[in-house]
């Protein structure tokens, strides 16, 4: 589907020089007496590289024909992560490079959305929050609820996040995997 460059929006996936690229940021502006343009920061989903490109307002952009499938993470074997398609039970293997920053957040049974372009998986979307147990953190200090300070805590997946002072070791917490921020204590 083709559209004008002025219709570019954040999160949109378009075809640029034959590769699918996600729009990370964009800015529409008209400098002085020049023609309108759209400055966009793009991420190439095939190579993983980020770059900027300036589109003229009259440029025609092609939206990438993407498919999305729900996958369930089964297990990790070395650098390979094994998934099962929840719709047709097909098995799929992705490596560390394909998962990128999402790799440490994988836990058995986790359901993710995989994006496919031309029948090949090119990216995944994690849920907005995941639950992990804190395996290491400083002990609770009396009166810690009076101040809004935080302390580092190591999760069971090895990732370190900042948590409020009142959170102790063994507590299950919800974390936003895209930002690595503590959300709240899990209500199990």
UniProtKB/Swiss-Prot annotation:
Keywords, alphabetical: Cytoplasm, Elongation factor, Protein biosynthesis
SMART domains linked: EFP, Elong-fact-P_C
Pathways per UniProt: Protein biosynthesis; polypeptide chain elongation
Subcellular location, principal: cytoplasm
Compartments, as annotated in UniProt: Cytoplasm
An example Gene Ontology CC term for this record: cytoplasm
Name of protein: Elongation factor P
Organism field: Gemmatimonas aurantiaca (strain DSM 14586 / JCM 11422 / NBRC 100505 / T-27)
Phylogenetic classification of the source organism: Bacteria, Pseudomonadati, Gemmatimonadota, Gemmatimonadia, Gemmatimonadales
